[in-house]
């Protein structure tokens, strides 16, 4: 680990005049500039942000020697704020499989309670700790943590795994592709070179060079909404809850967000007037005056970082262009309400990693990658619709919508039934892949929570442990009462396909490959009937439930590994 990386870890955060202290990684001349023999890499990832690093870590864990190219030499955005801070349970489950969850949990702030105010009146609240959508997982509903920390932990984990070559100060300038490979032209401080890969994943963000050169249409619009981020430390700490104001009296009746992050820093987002100048709203004296209006003139704070931001919403027409696939902000951009942007990119990577490995291993047809486009583009469009409704609630674009919004707020002040209509952001949740070509029964396409069980093969304690051990194989989970001859038939099937079979029992039994699930939570999550086999994908999505019959299961696997065409 570089010395400046260690120093930055110890310093944590510094004052406003220097912003956040981030690690710096050196440029190392790649083999292509050292005169080594030319090689074709299995995968090249363009962009070392949250999505690119998640995918790189996933591939490293699966033993794929990929290359990651990033045009910067650090994590986060130099000179920028905390950026994305709110990591949802599904993302935390992914990080658990990748081996970085414990660091994130130790550094971040867990929360489950949210409150929304209109003026001084609380008009909506929730506690996700008691929600059935969250209460089965070993991971909490949400953890707040500055984005650069998460990226930092991923870089460390990638280095620890040792399969992926992360190349800093490497800017991709051009892309060309043939029937069997993609060639990237890369500019570095040491010169330019060409890099060839079987597959390229573009995670380079909304200013992607690749998608422009490949001519992939993008649809969207820039919002007029303007905000100012203020990352501050309080000497006296408020509760670790998500508080939002629709009409904050201390912000000229505009919206405000308040979240706690790591290192005792709070993230305050203030909605600004559309005609305010960016430089003016971010001046320290203006920010301090704004904070004094909210917390009182004697508030004792330290400004860590301040900056304005605007946002846009857009989505590519397709997420695959030949051998180039798009993920994260290169594929879709959405407003920040509900923490759906960064979490969506993490889940893009989770969806894509195992599919790439199956294709590279020859166990699946390349058409399997078309399912990434189908599933994740539908998820992006759902997220855009959801965040779009929040945007319209917070900033009604027409007089009629403002009347409706004001009526909802007035009703919510007095009547509980109206509180569910208050919309300051529907929080990130895993998408359901209703129309996925990989679904093999009506139960398919649903995310399964990371439940714990009493005992399992190999010492696995959770479902994430189990899929991690299975690598890119599909899990076939059946009742422990299955007849021995049928079990042996499934084992023979597992020798022909990427499949791992496991039995589920409520009570201890003397059989191999048995999960002891006394509470029945795993069976509940899988909706597993007696005589059924649940097929669980490596990304903890249910492909479906089929009869415990090797012909039916093999047909389902062929359908999955052909991208729905089998």
Residue ranges: model-predicted function:
Residues 20-22, 262, 278-344, 364, ...:
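FAD/FMN-dependent oxidoreductases across multiple families
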Residues 9, 79-157:
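Active-site-adjacent segment of FAD-dependent monooxygenases/related oxidoreductases
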Residues 168-182:
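A conserved short coil-to-beta-strand element within the FAD-binding core of flavoproteins
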Residues 122, 156, 199, 203-311:
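Conserved FAD-binding catalytic core of PHBH/FMO-like flavoproteins
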Residues 60-82:
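Glycine-rich FAD pyrophosphate-binding loop
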Residues 48-50, 147:
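Glycine-rich Rossmann-fold phosphate-binding loop(s) that bind the pyrophosphate
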Residues 1-42, 46, 54-62, 66, ...:
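Helical substrate-recognition/capping region of FAD-dependent monooxygenase/halogenase enzymes
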């Amino acid at each position: 680990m570089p010395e400046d990386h260690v120093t930055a870890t110890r310093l944590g955060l510094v004052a406003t005049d220097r912003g956040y202290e981030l690690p710096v990684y050196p440029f190392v001349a790649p083999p292509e500039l050292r005169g080594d023999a030319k090689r074709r890499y299995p995968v090249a990832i363009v962009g070392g942000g949250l999505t690119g690093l998640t995918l790189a870590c996933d591939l490293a864990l699966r033993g794929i020697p990929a290359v990651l190219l990033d045009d910067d030499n650090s994590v986060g955005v130099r000179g920028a704020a905390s950026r994305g801070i709110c990591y949802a349970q599904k993302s935390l489950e992914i990080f658990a499989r990748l081996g970085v969850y414990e660091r994130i949990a130790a550094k971040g702030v867990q929360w489950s309670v949210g409150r929304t105010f209109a003026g001084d009146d609380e008009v909506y609240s929730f506690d996700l700790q008691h929600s059935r959508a969250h209460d089965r997982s070993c991971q909490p509903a949400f953890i707040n943590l500055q984005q650069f920390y998460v990226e930092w932990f991923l870089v460390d984990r990638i280095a620890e795994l040792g399969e992926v070559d992360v190349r800093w100060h490497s800017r991709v300038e051009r892309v060309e592709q043939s029937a069997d490979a993609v060639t990237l032209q890369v500019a570095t401080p040491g010169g330019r070179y060409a890099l060839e890969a079987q597959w390229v994943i573009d995670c380079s963000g909304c200013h992607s060079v690749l998608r422009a050169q490949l001519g992939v249409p993008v649809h969207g619009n820039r919002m007029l909404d303007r905000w100012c981020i203020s990352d501050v430390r309080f000497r006296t700490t408020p509760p670790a809850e998500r508080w939002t104001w629709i009409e904050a009296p201390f912000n000229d009746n505009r919206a405000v967000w308040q979240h706690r992050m790591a290192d005792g820093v709070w993230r305050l987002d203030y909605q600004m007037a559309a005609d305010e100048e960016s430089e003016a709203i971010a001046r320290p004296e203006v920010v301090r005056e704004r904070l004094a209006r909210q917390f009182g003139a004697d508030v004792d704070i330290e400004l860590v970082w301040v900056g304005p931001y605007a946002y846009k919403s857009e989505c590519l027409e397709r997420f695959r262009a030949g051998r180039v696939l798009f993920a994260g902000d290169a594929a879709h951009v959405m407003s920040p309400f509900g923490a759906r942007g960064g979490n969506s990119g993490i889940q893009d990577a989770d969806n894509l990693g195992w599919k790439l490995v199956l294709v590279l291993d020859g166990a699946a047809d390349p058409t399997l990658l078309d399912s990434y486009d189908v599933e994740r583009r539908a998820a992006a469009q759902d997220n855009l619709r959801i965040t779009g409704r929040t945007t319209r609630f917070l900033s009604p674009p027409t007089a009629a919508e403002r009347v409706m919004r004001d009526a909802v707020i007035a009703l919510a002040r007095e009547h509980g039934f109206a509180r569910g209509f208050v919309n300051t952001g529907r929080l990130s949740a895993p998408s359901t892949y209703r129309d996925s070509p990989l679904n093999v029964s009506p139960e398919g396409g649903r995310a399964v929570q990371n439940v714990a069980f009493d005992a399992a093969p190999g010492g696995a304690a959770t479902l994430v442990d189990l899929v991690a051990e299975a690598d890119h194989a599909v899990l076939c989970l059946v009742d422990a009462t299955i007849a021995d001859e049928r079990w042996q038939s499934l084992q023979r099937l597992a020798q022909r396909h990427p499949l791992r079979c496991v039995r589920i029992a409520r009570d201890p039994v003397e059989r191999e490959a048995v999960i002891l699930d006394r509470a029945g939570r795993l069976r509940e999550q899988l909706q597993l009937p007696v005589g059924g086999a649940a097929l669980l994908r490596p990304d903890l999505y249910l492909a479906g439930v089929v009869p415990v019959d090797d012909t039916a299961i093999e047909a389902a696997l062929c359908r999955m590994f052909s991208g729905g065409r089998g």
